[in-house]
């Protein structure tokens, strides 16, 4: 976990959390549990939960994560935030929004604090968090 992320997750504990990652579900849950925040994540979708043809940036895993948290009926009426450190994550967020359709909105946040360079990406995020603390302000705009 990036330094300060525990604070961000805890401050917004009242919001439903999920993870969709190219890591394995077991590894993700192990890290979350080691920081004492595993119970805050209602859904964790790892690469091992998604078939090879449906890996990111295909929206399948993201939609599965959202539906696990909110149910199928509510999934297309939500405002969601997806935070990622690769350009493919921003494309993934756009693909989830398109797959959910209707009134769903997925806000893409690039984790610039991970030494990525989102200002050079072709697929632009809605926000760039250059420091973990920036997430407090970005998420706060929508709560």
Predicted regions and their residues:
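Acidic, Mg2+-coordinating phosphoryl-transfer loop and its flanking beta/alpha structural elements
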Residues: 82-128
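CheY-like receiver
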Residues: 8-11, 65-68, 138-142
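Substrate-recognition "cap/lid" segment bordering the active-site pocket of phosphatases
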Residues: 18, 22-81, 87-98, 104
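Short, flexible, glycine/charge-rich loop motifs used to bind or transfer phosphoryl groups or to couple energy/partner
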Residues: 7-8, 34, 71, 116-119
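Well-ordered alpha-helical segments embedded in enzymatic catalytic cores
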Residues: 4, 61-65, 134
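Alpha-helix N-cap/helix-start and coil->helix boundary motif
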Residues: 6, 24-26, 38, 87, ...
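Short, acidic loop-to-helix structural element flanking the phosphoryl-transfer center
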Residues: 1-19, 25-29
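Structural recognition of alpha->loop->beta junctions
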Residues: 37-48, 116-140
């Amino acid at each position: 976990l990036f330094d300060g992320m525990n604070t961000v997750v805890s401050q917004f504990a009242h919001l439903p959390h999920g993870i969709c990652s190219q890591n394995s579900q077991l590894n993700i849950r192990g890290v979350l549990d080691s920081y004492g925040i595993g119970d805050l994540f209602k859904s964790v979708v790892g690469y091992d939960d998604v078939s090879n043809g449906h890996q990111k940036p295909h929206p399948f895993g993201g939609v599965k994560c959202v539906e696990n948290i909110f149910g199928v009926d509510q999934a297309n009426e939500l405002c969601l935030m997806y935070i990622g450190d690769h350009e493919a994550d921003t494309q993934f967020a756009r693909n989830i929004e398109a797959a959910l359709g209707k009134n769903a909105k997925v806000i893409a946040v690039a984790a610039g604090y991970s030494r990525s360079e989102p200002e050079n990406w072709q697929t632009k995020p809605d926000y760039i968090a250059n420091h973990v603390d920036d997430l407090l302000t970005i998420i706060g705009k929508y709560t």
